[in-house]
């Protein structure tokens, strides 16, 4: 049941991101993406000014990601997530179902801005409330986190590329996922044992400022460095889809790799190799995409390590990591970062992730070196 729930919530992640991003692109009026311009790049067609487009995208990012720490704190304090999960999924689905037949929005105005805020709120609430159920399955393993966060990238790409066509279908998928979650008994009773365990667990510090600062720094510079990495070819439709698939594969693999080889291995091997591929092989699509996959293996790792930094406020930690990743990516769009600096930032990010467990008084469950022998794991199971 738990594995099915994680898989369903991952699919819901795809549907939610596709719905909200599709609305953003319908709102800003991008008519076509992927057509080659005279310069050989992607052609964008919009009746709105660049400032208006930037304001809409920035507002969405700040609300959808910036509110997650506050939603996470609410979930941690109230120890409830199911009502938020269903409200966000059904809310986004219903709003999309109303917008499409009404041919809305027609432009950027007060009403469309209000709907944008609503979709952003749904996105923020969904990520944390759905994440709460995945976090409950990630007390001693990182893999569920990787599976959950992986498909969001695919949803963003589909919403970005096919905004007018997929809005209604994406909203319907949100509602369908909510119905499926009801069938799988995704309720607050399922979370109660998790909250009880972390509530009575002995911890040396409720908030580890040193590891939290390292992880916040790591996700910020990773977002900054990753967004600034050069790409030596046109961002056409096929590439956007392939990049999303590789991103999803990397995030999913990162959790399993951390469980098998330790979080330090992912940080100190995958990130440096990814930086080399993305910088020095950026003109070769296959190698660049491989680097992109390796680059994203660290995402579930940083999330999982943040739970040791805030052991009783894990949903808050989840939101904090998401918020600072967004801030790094947004900052990268506002400044010019040379390739060598982006390369260095990715390496620094890996070092910060690897260092975080060593300055934390609350040690993570996953081995930092190599997995335990299978025989030892079987003997542990017999003792239980």
Residue map of PLM features:
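Central cavity-lining transmembrane alpha-helices of secondary-active solute carriers
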Residues: 54-73, 241-253
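Cytoplasmic membrane-interface "Motif A"-like loop-to-helix N-cap segments
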Residues: 77-89, 259-272
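C-terminal ends and interior cores of transmembrane alpha-helices
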Residues: 89-107, 272-284
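Intracellular juxtamembrane helix-capping segments at the cytosolic ends
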Residues: 124-138, 296-311
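C-terminal transmembrane helical hairpin of 12-TM major facilitator-type secondary transporters
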Residues: 265-302
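A late C-terminal transmembrane helix in Major Facilitator Superfamily
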Residues: 311-342
